[in-house]
């Protein structure tokens, strides 16, 4: 049978009565979650009311939107989410629980809506899988846009269930660096993102296990990457690191860096 349902609502008024965030909507959302729990169905709720921590009572609510997500880059007349958007929401909306932002796009323009685009580089899309927490993730692009691209390996590898989380460095609205440990393996993952400004960051690896070596699989913005003119440029490399090392990371404008650490 069906074990997971993603819900979504297209009308401004539910049943032509009240807005999603009215009392009618609040009762409806709660009823959906309770009924789904009865049948052991997990929910990914889009267009929800403000997150309140209800997943503590109903853990089948795996994740929900409740944020100006990446879909706004596809059609929003205001140009979509600005580059600094994802450097803010982990520290605001993210405090209220998991959010389904729907990142993972490799094709950055939308021919159906001329003038719209995803306002990041490819590597920032990868890094968001670490920066923004959701126990259910998706790859938001078409399958053909991933074919033959090494960067898709990171999306296939990155888990959604974490054992430890550290904010290694951040300035809200400018940049952030998150490190998370996979709950089911000894692997660590790091995501670094920046706003419209290119920047260089030093990432200390003190969160790794002492006296152990790791293979770092690094997906970084290319030297010529730029979110408006060359968002798909990236480079991949591997190196052996330990907890005493510090990685120097270069981020393009609205860029990112995604790293997987595999314990040897």
Please name every model-derived segment:
Residues 237-264:
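C-terminal beta-strand-rich structural cap/linker in extracellular carbohydrate-active enzymes
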């Amino acid at each position: 049978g069906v074990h997971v349902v993603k819900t979504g609502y297209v009308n401004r008024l539910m049943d032509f009565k009240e807005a999603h965030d009215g009392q009618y909507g609040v009762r409806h959302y709660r009823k959906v979650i309770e009924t789904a729990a009865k049948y052991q169905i997990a929910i990914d709720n889009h267009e929800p009311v403000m997150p309140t921590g209800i997943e503590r009572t109903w853990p089948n609510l795996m994740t929900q939107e409740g944020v100006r997500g990446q879909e706004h880059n596809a059609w929003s007349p205001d140009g979509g989410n600005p580059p600094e958007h994802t450097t803010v929401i982990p520290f605001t909306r993210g405090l209220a629980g998991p959010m389904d932002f729907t990142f993972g796009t490799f094709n950055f323009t939308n021919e159906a809506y001329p003038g719209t685009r995803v306002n990041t580089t490819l590597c920032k899309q990868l890094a968001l899988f670490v920066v923004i927490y959701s126990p259910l993730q998706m790859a938001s692009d078409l399958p053909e846009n991933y074919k033959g691209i090494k960067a898709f390996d990171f999306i296939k590898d990155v888990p959604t269930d974490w054992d430890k989380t550290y904010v290694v460095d951040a300035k809200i609205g400018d940049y952030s660096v998150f490190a998370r440990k996979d709950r089911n393996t000894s692997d660590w993952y790091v995501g670094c993102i920046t706003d419209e400004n290119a920047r260089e960051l030093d990432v200390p690896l003190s969160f790794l296990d002492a006296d152990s070596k790791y293979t770092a699989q690094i997906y970084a913005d290319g030297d010529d990457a730029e979110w408006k003119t060359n968002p798909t440029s990236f480079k991949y490399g591997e190196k052996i690191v330990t907890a005493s090392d510090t990685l120097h990371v270069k981020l393009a404008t609205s860029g990112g860096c995604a790293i997987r650490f595999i314990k040897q």
